[in-house]
Amino acid sequence: MLIIETLPLLRQQIRRLRMEGKRVALVPTMGNLHDGHMKLVDEAKARADVVVVSIFVNPMQFDRPEDLARYPRTLQEDCEKLNKRKVDLVFAPSVKEIYPNGTETHTYVDVPGLSTMLEGASRPGHFRGVSTIVSKLFNLVQPDIACFGEKDFQQLALIRKMVADMGFDIEIVGVPIMRAKDGLALSSRNGYLTAEQRKIAPGLYKVLSSIADKLQAGERDLDEIIAIAGQELNEKGFRSDDIQIRDADTLLEISENSKRAVILVAAWLGDARLIDNKIVELA
């Protein structure tokens, strides 16, 4: 497994792979890898000749400096996991390598609408940072496919739109959420939970599933469903942050023409902001 930290070396390797006619898959990450990331890697390996994993804690997508400062950096352990998975290339650049003149004056990519609604409304600049770094990685790695987790549902929708709008010739693969046995969606932020909070955490998925059951049973008073769910989260020990029920294909409000709904839940548990989602077919 090759570990590359600079743009010239990365470009050199990508040129070689292109000359050899290899099909390249990219898995963009911020490191602190867990089994959910490994599922992305496995999906990439099944679809390509060469797998490139990027590890970069992107300062442009953090709306709170304290979150950026405390985000776990575990490059050595991450590389050991990826080596066992037989990943071909790890791109782990420094912030200086990606943003040589800082982030304030760096050219950015913005996806109107999707970047400022829902999660974007409560995290200003977050999705602009995501679309900027992902487009830069696409430009550098020139992958045939790129794999993203469905846990970050809005992020995946944003990247699909960016790819369509910008004409990137890249297949975007959404990989289903990987869960612990008790239902908790795997996330790097789970590491912020205390042992006691970890016991409470699966309650998020239980509330999510309860909303899904109500929708499947034909209930359509969304305001009431959301209000009850928020109350249930707070009673379980969470601080409910945001609960949305949207059209899964547009992320707009549910309408009579909506065929699928996506339930998007965000809640604080101690210092961890946990997110999860579930898609429901509407009868």
From Swiss-Prot:
Family listed: Belongs to the pantothenate synthetase family.
Protein name: Pantothenate synthetase
Residues that bind ATP: 30-37, 149-152, 186-189
A GO biological-process term: pantothenate biosynthetic process
InterPro entries the UniProt entry points to: Cyt_trans-like, Pantoate_ligase, Pantoate_ligase_C, Rossmann-like_a/b/a_fold
Binding residues for (R)-pantoate: Q61, Q155
Entry EC no(s): 6.3.2.1
Class in the EC hierarchy, top level: ligase
Functional pathway: Cofactor biosynthesis; (R)-pantothenate biosynthesis; (R)-pantothenate from (R)-pantoate and beta-alanine: step 1/1
Keyword flag Membrane: no
Active site: H37
SUPFAM superfamilies: Nucleotidylyl transferase
Quaternary structure and interacting proteins, as annotated: Homodimer.
Additional facts recorded: The reaction proceeds by a bi uni uni bi ping pong mechanism.
Catalytic activities: (R)-pantoate + beta-alanine + ATP = (R)-pantothenate + AMP + diphosphate + H(+)
Record's subcellular location: Cytoplasm
Major site of localization recorded for this protein: cytoplasm
Task performed by this protein: Catalyzes the condensation of pantoate with beta-alanine in an ATP-dependent reaction via a pantoyl-adenylate intermediate.
Species of the source: Escherichia coli (strain SMS-3-5 / SECEC)
Signal peptide feature range: none
Keyword ATP-binding found: yes
Pfam families in alphabetical order: Pantoate_ligase
